[in-house]
Amino acid sequence: MDERFNKEFEQLALPLLDPLYNFACWLSGNPDEARDLVQETFVKALKAFASFQAGTNFRAWMFRILRNTFLTSRTGLERRNTSQQDEDGYDEAVVSYDTPELAIMRQADTELVQASIARLSPVFQEVLLLADIEEMKYQEVAETLAIPIGTVMSRLARARKQVREHIVDALGKKS
């Protein structure tokens, strides 16, 4: 492969590194596995880059490769819904200038939303994560998942409704 080819791939792919990693974390539930998925995605994409059609949606193409890589790597395995913790048993901390009370409330909110998303079926999770977390347009989500745009919209509506219901239910139980 020539250098121009590699530079073109780099320019298109590197800005997607963080969004792909975030999506891989959500899919796998494991930061180490997510890093492996992203690395494998980049290798596969670089090998197939010559077949990528200029003018089509590169972002959707990369997310589709990542998703397919995840699905083939997980064949026959049950997905783990546990969060990966560091060696001390604590989730990695985020530097914050909030008061301790606000930080605790924000962490509780984040955990509730994450738990609500984790309860969704994988087809609803994928659509919700791509549309709402990765901020993809409906058409991009449809291209990434190889489903009609109407299916994206209906799955997204159902996913949002289920998340909302779970949060309302969880908050109602705490009162």
Role assignments for model-derived ranges:
Residues 118, 122-126, 131-151, 165:
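Helix-turn-helix DNA-binding module
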Residues 18, 50-64, 149:
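Short, aromatic/basic-enriched loop-to-helix "N-cap" motif that marks the start
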Residues 80-106, 137:
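Internal acidic/polar
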Residues 36-43, 56-68:
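Structural recognition of an alpha-helix C-terminal capping motif at a helix-to-coil junction
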Residues 53, 64-85, 106:
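Arg/Lys-rich amphipathic alpha helix in sigma70-family domain 2
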Residues 2-9, 82, 106, 139, ...:
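C-terminal edge and immediately downstream basic/flexible tail or linker adjoining helix-turn-helix-like DNA-binding
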